[in-house]
Amino acid sequence: MNWLTNVVRPKIRNILRRETPENLWIKCPDTGQLVFYKDVEQNQFVIPGSNYHMRMGALARLRSVFDNETWYDVALPEVTADPLKFRDERKYADRIKDARTKTGAHDAVKVGYGKLEGLGVVAAVQDFDFMGGSLGMAAGEAIIRGLELAVEKHAPFIMFAASGGARMQEGILSLMQMPRTTVAVQMLREAGLPYIVVLTNPTTGGVTASYAMLGDIQLAEPGALIGFAGARVIEQTIREKLPDGFQRAEYLRDHGMVDMVVHRHELRPTLARLCRILTKTPLPAVEEIAASDDAAQDAEAAAATEIVVTPPEAPSPTAPQA
């Protein structure tokens, strides 16, 4: 046995071949710059420098919204996983299984209930990583359950939309979720509760033809692609060249389809302010804000919300007149 050949060299070779994690670096789609993944994650998945908004998973989105990154997961109704026994190149059941393994989620929509600057809210998040955030039976039931819970809790409902549209593998059962979710939104509206929609990149297809465009307030993240059909399909249909930036959040804001385009770092305080205005809830005391936010945000929140009232100076005594 050659000790140098069989013991030392393989160990050295293993050190040199040590694998690098696949997600160690992220390439900015806008500038092509390579950015350390942890830096992007800590920056709410916004690329430092270019401010490009990457897609956010459902869990990361909920953590960014609720106080102390704490919320209650809402139990969602069970539905038939593959009602049509659909198969194209692969079985639909296998696609669902792979998506669940990849994301750790049961389906494309996750619903949570918690506090937003002390105010109870229900939030539903579509995860684009789960089969393109497509709307199927499970996603429709999740959104409807979230809206029902908002009525039960008498709380605002915030919808973070990100989808390629209806899930084709479920056929008409998927399309049926469009009117069902629309009716549920109307139920929330009749209860006098706010429905706020945040359009993220991308929000397209049947989702924009239903609940995603029904908000009392329509917000969008910078650069988000929002529309029904794709730009290429529209150009081929109308035989005209579309304007630059067509279907982007800023274009829709400038043309009245979106109320505000909000940077992700400003989204949480903006949502809290809108919820308080729409529910006519007074601002919390400085002490309540400090209790609900983490230590890093306490000083900023107190400085931003504290109002110092200076009493008027007492008038100087007037000398008696002769």
UniProtKB/Swiss-Prot annotation:
Residues 24-293 form the CoA carboxyltransferase N-terminal domain. It is an enzyme of class 2 (transferase). It holds the Pfam family Carboxyl_trans. Keywords: ATP-binding, Cytoplasm, Fatty acid biosynthesis, Fatty acid metabolism, Lipid biosynthesis, Lipid metabolism, Nucleotide-binding, Transferase. It catalyses: N(6)-carboxybiotinyl-L-lysyl-[protein] + acetyl-CoA = N(6)-biotinyl-L-lysyl-[protein] + malonyl-CoA. Signal peptide: none annotated. GO terms for cellular component: acetate CoA-transferase complex. Its main location: cytoplasm. Pathway: Lipid metabolism; malonyl-CoA biosynthesis; malonyl-CoA from acetyl-CoA: step 1/1. GO terms for biological process: fatty acid biosynthetic process; malonyl-CoA biosynthetic process. It comes from the Bacteria. PANTHER family: ACETYL-COENZYME A CARBOXYLASE CARBOXYL TRANSFERASE SUBUNIT BETA, CHLOROPLASTIC. This is Acetyl-coenzyme A carboxylase carboxyl transferase subunit beta. The lineage of its organism: Bacteria, Pseudomonadati, Pseudomonadota, Alphaproteobacteria, Hyphomicrobiales. The gene is accD.
